[in-house]
Amino acid sequence: MPQLPAWLEKYRMLPRRVLLFAAGQFLINLITSAQFLLLNLFLKDKGLGDPAIAALSSQRFVATFLLAIPAGLWLRGRPLRMPMFVGSILFPLTALASLEAVNAGMMSLASGCFLAMGFSGLLLNVGSLPMALRLTPPKQTSEALSLLFATWAGASICGGVLSSVLQGMGHLDIFGHHLVFDEYATLLVLTLAGFGAPFLYARLPDPVPEKKHVGHWLHVERRDWGLLTAALVPTICIATGAGLSIQFLNLFFSHVHQLSSASYSAYGSISNVLVLFAGLIVPEVKRRLGWRGAIFGVQTVAVMLLLTMGFTELWKTCGWALPVAVVCFILRQPLMSMAGPSTSELTMSYVGERNRELVSACNGAIWSGAWWLAARTFEILRTHHLPYWMVFLVTSILYLAGTFSYLLLIRTVERRRPDDADHAPISEPGHV
């Protein structure tokens, strides 16, 4: 049997509990990736315009925005398996209810289901990174986080391939039943697959941190406020930028370049193959290039690709515009996603063990709040017919601001002793 490369062999050495957790994440991500790829197109086929799609989609983020920080404060130092187990049951249920409500034309019910889906996703998102770090030996943190991020790419590949295959078939007659394979069918199949996640989460151990939170669960130590603020600034910038444009890329290709949902899914699958590979080599890239190369370098190139993709709208009648936009789309996501494991590890190292649940919750609140606000902003901008390229330009500016903010965290973490990098909090955030 041929020997695996050294960087890939490190994944084989991960504990079984980490692999179980990653498998559960993969099944949950089948739902979220399917929604990312196809939900807007499904809503468009149901007769909703861009503003209505943005308004309905934004409901997913309201619950997380309002409840994430209280949830993070309460979960500090507590067992995480039960909240994640409950979330893994509720998330597929509410996703299925949302899908069926839209399909039945019951938009008021759909709005409530989207809100409930956001709450159930909150339980999963707040505990995900802290749970992964509790399950993983410190020396294997980079590989564990990269594997978790790679589950998104793997789920997206499955969703894209399934969408392309089903929509390529179009329809099928079985025993007198006429089955139509469209965006709804793909969303339904992948949502049902997500019901396997609770069975995997139920088999996980339930470790608690060595240092439990002391004091009332709402209390945050005074010295931690500056630490938390510095850690969250990059997330605010990047989440707001992403919310303005990334969640609507499928609409950009549909409206500007008249790309079909099947073609978009196929290109998305190609991109996610690269995301999967790029995510797995993140630990090796970080070892060779350091934090700056793994975060600042790859994100800067990704921003340039996003700008180029947006500017193709100005020349959309030219034959080269669509190929250039597709190439930028395929390459941008792997590079931007490649920084994800590194930024998560950097942030968790920066804030220390006692603040991980709180930072994870704050990140969830920021992403949800930013995406909700950005979706509403996008709704207004598109109502006034602002072109997509201008939206992408704003996104790029915000991305660059967030990327440069990470440099401040990198400088602080690099000044610390390597032995303390995984667990010790920064005692002097004012030096950042």
Provide a role label for each language-model segment:
Residues 1-15, 204-233, 425-432:
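Juxtamembrane intracellular "pre-TM" segments in multi-pass secondary transporters
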Residues 167, 191-210, 405-410:
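C-terminal membrane-cytosol helix-exit motif in multi-pass small-molecule transporters
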Residues 4-65, 229-268:
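Helix-loop boundary and gating motifs at the non-cytosolic
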Residues 145-167, 364-375:
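Glycine-rich segments within core transmembrane alpha-helices of 12-TM secondary carriers
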Residues 67-80, 167, 278-291, 382-383:
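Helix-to-loop junctions at the C-terminal end of transmembrane segments
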Residues 89-105, 301-318:
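C-terminal ends and interior cores of transmembrane alpha-helices
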Residues 26, 107-124, 236, 320-338:
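Hydrophobic core of transmembrane alpha-helices in multi-pass small-molecule transporters
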Residues 168-192, 380-399:
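A membrane-interface helix-boundary motif in multi-pass transporters
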